[in-house]
């Protein structure tokens, strides 16, 4: 058998049926949709509509809320950091911050900065400047001879507002 001789098994792929193309095809006129009515018409059905019965999403109770003050951290584990150090993708000589972790491809998203978590082992002596750190991670970093500085990350909107305010103050003076 050669690559050009490979075929699908019999009946593995069904050919597309062209409905509504004459009575000789067996699927002409109504195209397998029955007679008149809402279900015979074209267009997408209404999502979640159950024929007038109360839909499931309305039968179930409301639950929870969206906390507008919730912090969005990019969470990075110590094991992932150690792997990057071993692969020489992270420089341990300087301070490791959000930008360095993002460049290394380990911190994705996180508009409020990076939070380091304690999963995995860290043997390298590393100093961090991050938005958050768990107690276990802090202990492991200090045990390895490193240090952690927790900084407050100012959101972009607040930075822009502060910058705009200083520009206005400079204009007045």
UniProtKB/Swiss-Prot annotation:
Keyword field: Ribonucleoprotein, Ribosomal protein, RNA-binding, rRNA-binding
Subunit-level organization: Part of the 50S ribosomal subunit.
Biased composition (Basic and acidic residues): 1-11
PROSITE patterns: RIBOSOMAL_L15 (PS00475)
Source organism (scientific name): Rhizorhabdus wittichii (strain DSM 6014 / CCUG 31198 / JCM 15750 / NBRC 105917 / EY 4224 / RW1) (Sphingomonas wittichii)
NCBIfam families cross-referenced by the UniProt entry: rplO_bact
Protein's UniProt name: Large ribosomal subunit protein uL15
GO CC aspect terms: cytosolic large ribosomal subunit
A molecular function GO annotation: structural constituent of ribosome
GO biological process: translation
Domain of life of the source: Bacteria
Record-linked SUPFAM superfamilies: Ribosomal proteins L15p and L18e
Family: Belongs to the universal ribosomal protein uL15 family.
């Amino acid at each position: 058998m050669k690559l050009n001789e490979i075929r699908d098994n019999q009946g593995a792929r069904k050919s597309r049926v062209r409905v509504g193309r004459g009575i000789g095809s067996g699927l002409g006129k109504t195209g397998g949709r029955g007679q008149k009515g809402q279900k015979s018409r074209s267009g997408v059905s209404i999502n979640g509509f159950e024929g007038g019965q109360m839909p499931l999403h309305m039968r179930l109770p409301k639950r929870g809320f969206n906390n507008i003050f919730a912090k969005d951290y990019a969470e990075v584990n110590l094991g992932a950091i150690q792997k990057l150090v071993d692969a020489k993708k992270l420089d341990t000589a300087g301070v490791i911050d959000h930008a360095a972790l993002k460049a290394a491809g380990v911190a994705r998203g996180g508009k409020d900065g990076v939070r380091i978590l304690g999963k995995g082992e860290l043997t390298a002596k590393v100093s961090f400047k991050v938005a958050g750190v768990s107690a276990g991670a802090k202990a492991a970093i200090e045990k390895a001879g490193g240090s952690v500085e927790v900084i407050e990350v100012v959101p972009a909107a607040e930075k822009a507002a502060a910058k705009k305010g200083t520009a206005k103050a400079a204009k007045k003076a």
